[in-house]
């Protein structure tokens, strides 16, 4: 009967997943029912990333003018690998002086403890990167990535093409026990036999090592070559799925410190927008999204995120747009308030109007519905070929008029003009809505396709998020919709650390003394 091996890992410090400050440790249990010749037992801590990208026949035909079979491109990167021998002990191993003679281990149960150093900050594969290695990161901003798609085998069992392609990129960490048996006495089995057992675990670095560096040349218009294999979009379970396959042009690859990396992968990682039309969520054509790229500006120290388009008003001359103003909307942690006053997220939303103030003051403008979506763009890269996967998570959908309040969310009596009188603005007080002001981000620690919600970028995998705020308006009985995109937003699955001031010690009055009579 074969030996029985089990691996028991000590729990992480936070009780949920291993992080940068953890030291992987545990116990290896070995049960033998009969004597076994063992040369050594090793514990290996390792991590790797793997991507598979595809080019379909239609794209190959456009490039070569002939039908050719679809091409698969694979990439494999070793992120870390550490080995520790637990049997025999160091003093015995050193005394062997290179001898390969095995030990005869009697039947019974044996336990071996192990402990590794803290996780490294940078991946090991960087030493193998060259100028011909096309990657999403440089040597300077490369960090050890989090676990991603560790349950990829389950995707292959589901009859869903989107999940199937989503599983083509993965980051896996594991502890592996390797038992090297003694050499067989038979001449036809001249090699040492290996017995292996693995235990995967979830690793997510500290937030400072998850931050996705902004792409260079962000304002430069890049022309990626599409193979026109963008599939039909569909909506299931409040999720929007899409995918695309593109070839990274050589002009978009820059060499830094001897490593080629993509200056900006904006074109093949731009998610489709979601529209509400007659009560249904529908996808907007790609052309209308890319042609309305937003630009942010600063007002009173706050970033301004304008709506993607202006809405014409009934008088035919005026228009309005929505602006989200925030100091810290580019990073969102789990359990952060989204609309609450002081959250610095969606607590300052303004309606900005252009036109005649007399005409504007007569209009009936009312917010009717609100929907907030989290858009995910996951891009896999292999040998210069990039495949994009897109999805959308609905964070909230609410009828703004369902709960009546004494004060309306938008009061045009509070409208004010700017310094030159060309524009007018009025605050949309979403922070006063009784439901929205209690809404926190990802309170339940949701797993999307088996993964927690976090942004990251590594050599061949990039996962970024953006937020999409949709508001349906009633303007003099006509329904219109505004859309604001915050792209990208750094998402963390950790809870934000709040630094609390140390409380002052309680005042204790000094003791009183009385003079004793002599």
Curated annotation (Swiss-Prot):
Gene Ontology cellular component terms for the protein in this record: cytoplasm
Taxonomy of the source species: Eukaryota, Fungi, Dikarya, Ascomycota, Saccharomycotina
Cellular location(s): Cytoplasm
Protein name stated in the entry: Arrestin-related trafficking adapter 10
Keywords, alphabetical: Cytoplasm, Endocytosis, Isopeptide bond, Ubl conjugation
PTM section of the record: Ubiquitinated by RSP5.
Function statement: May regulate endocytosis by recruiting RSP5 ubiquitin ligase activity to specific plasma membrane proteins in response to extracellular stimuli.
Cross-link Glycyl lysine isopeptide (Lys-Gly) (interchain with G-Cter in ubiquitin): where in chain: 118
Assembly and binders: Interacts with RSP5.
GO biological process: endocytosis
InterPro entries: Arrestin-like_C
Membership in a protein family: Belongs to the ART10 family.
